[in-house]
């Protein structure tokens, strides 16, 4: 069995969680599920009031909460958006979430916003830039964040730092934690032809504070080659489940989120997947005992 990493200080409970969808709210109120936490996308709650906040307040009274940002563009060349920083700070003050996270990606350039999580060049300049942005975000919040590893579809010739090493450097230099998206690891490994398990072994696993699981789509590029897309619109693939169990053998039990952002089924279908997450975590806990 692989050597297991020591765990960071507790944040989210080491249980199964689910991304919150407003269309499930009535069902949740009628029969609250036995879950450890819910995750919300920060930008959907950067308004002063309304139904979204009423629903989030209900969740916060009953569950741990993870706030996941998608638009701060930590990897971009532009300065961080002051309005988004203020919005994150307001959410933190209002709900005291158990975890706050963002992506290793960029989505803003020259003041324009792109509705996507775009890849960065892994070089020394990018490392300094992302470190500075993480430091700024963490200083704004007064707490460490978790940074999510990306799913990628292209690589840059200018990159001279391995992605896993880049993440190690970010964690070491900023004190941030890692949000380990296992589906992203699998998608990138297939797309670029590297060994997913070897990649995991090079990560700073002691810094992992949350794991994400999601489904992906299979497409073909212009040359007919298979490409996996981190689509979040399908059940978790069996290969990703296998990689998740391998990951838990390295990390021990970690708070694990099931993501579903497209083709959203009834809540019961998602809870069947979170039950499988809980079973994996229970096996991991038994091994750790």
Curated annotation (Swiss-Prot):
> InterPro entries per the record?
MbnB/TglH/ChrH, Xyl_isomerase-like_sf
Please report any disulfide bonds recorded for this protein chain, giving both cysteine positions.
none
Looking at the record's lineage, which domain of life comes first? Bacteria
Matching Pfam families: MbnB_TglH_ChrH
> Which NCBIfam families would you find in this protein's record?
PRK05409.1
Sequence similarity: Belongs to the UPF0276 family.
- Extract the PANTHER family matched here: UPF0276 PROTEIN HI_1600
Name of the protein: UPF0276 protein BB1291
What's the source species for this entry? Bordetella bronchiseptica (strain ATCC BAA-588 / NCTC 13252 / RB50)
């Amino acid at each position: 069995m692989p050597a297991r990493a020591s765990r960071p200080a507790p944040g989210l409970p080491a249980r199964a969680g689910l991304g919150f969808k407003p269309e499930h709210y009535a069902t949740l109120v009628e029969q609250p599920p036995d879950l450890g936490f819910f995750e919300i996308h920060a930008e959907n709650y950067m308004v002063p009031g309304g139904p979204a906040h009423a629903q989030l307040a209900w969740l916060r009274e009953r569950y741990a909460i993870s706030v996941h940002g998608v638009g701060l563009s930590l990897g971009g060349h532009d300065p961080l958006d002051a309005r988004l920083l203020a919005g994150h700070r307001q959410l933190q003050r209002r709900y005291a979430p158990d975890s706050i996270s963002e992506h290793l990606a960029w989505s803003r350039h020259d003041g324009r916003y792109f509705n996507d999580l775009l890849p960065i060049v892994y070089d020394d300049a990018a490392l300094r830039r992302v470190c500075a942005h993480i430091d700024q975000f963490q200083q704004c919040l007064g707490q460490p964040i978790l940074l999510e590893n990306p799913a990628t579809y292209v690589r840059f010739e200018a990159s001279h730092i391995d992605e896993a090493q880049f993440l190690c450097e970010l964690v070491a230099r900023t004190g941030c934690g890692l949000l380990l998206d296992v589906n992203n690891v699998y998608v990138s490994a297939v797309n670029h032809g590297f060994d997913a398990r070897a990649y995991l072994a090079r990560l700073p696993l002691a810094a992992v504070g949350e794991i994400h699981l999601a489904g992906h789509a299979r497409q073909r590029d212009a040359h007919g080659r298979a490409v996996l897309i981190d689509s979040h619109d399908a059940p978790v693939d069996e290969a990703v489940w296998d990689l998740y169990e391998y990951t838990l053998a390295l990390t021990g039990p970690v708070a694990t989120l099931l993501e579903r952002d497209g083709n959203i089924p009834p809540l019961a279908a998602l809870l069947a997947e979170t039950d499988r997450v809980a079973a994996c975590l229970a096996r991991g806990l038994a091994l750790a005992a």
